[in-house]
């Protein structure tokens, strides 16, 4: 991977910021899962969300299989950050940028494991609700 080229490409995207980190330095715990399970209306309704996405430990194992992690941040204004529905509505713009970053990594020969902070919205009705496998596993970003 050519880091200079990648960083130049990242600087051309509408990112608030980005940084690289060793996956061993990431913190994996169940606090975020608690929010999913107790506050998010999408929990259990998409393959990107618990329990479909797997356990925190399975996510940790997959992340630790990488030698480097790229964290990106975008900013979208909302009136009330505590309004989960309003916050979830900002998903499409961020996911589109995540997809662009994923493509840049693929062009460098890296198959990324893209995690998101929100549920998947690719399909109108997720296959998990019908007991079927994900129809778009190559496009779905699992929720952290």
Language-model region placement:
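TRNA-binding/sensing appendages of the translation machinery
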Residues: 1-22
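Catalytic cores of enzyme domains
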Residues: 16-46, 50-144
């Amino acid at each position: 991977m050519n880091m200079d080229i990648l960083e130049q490409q990242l600087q051309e995207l509408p990112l608030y910021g980005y940084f690289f980190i060793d996956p061993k330095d990431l913190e994996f715990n169940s606090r975020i899962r608690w929010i999913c399970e107790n506050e998010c209306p999408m929990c259990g309704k998409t393959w990107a969300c618990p329990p479909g996405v797997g356990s925190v430990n399975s996510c940790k194992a997959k992340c630790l299989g990488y030698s480097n992690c790229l964290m990106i941040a975008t900013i979208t204004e909302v009136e009330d950050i505590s309004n989960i529905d309003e916050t979830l509505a900002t998903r499409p713009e961020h996911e589109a940028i995540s997809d662009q970053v994923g493509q840049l990594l693929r062009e460098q020969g890296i198959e990324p494991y893209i995690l998101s902070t929100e549920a998947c919205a690719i399909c109108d009705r997720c296959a998990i609700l019908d007991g079927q496998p994900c129809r778009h596993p190559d496009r779905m970003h699992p929720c952290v």
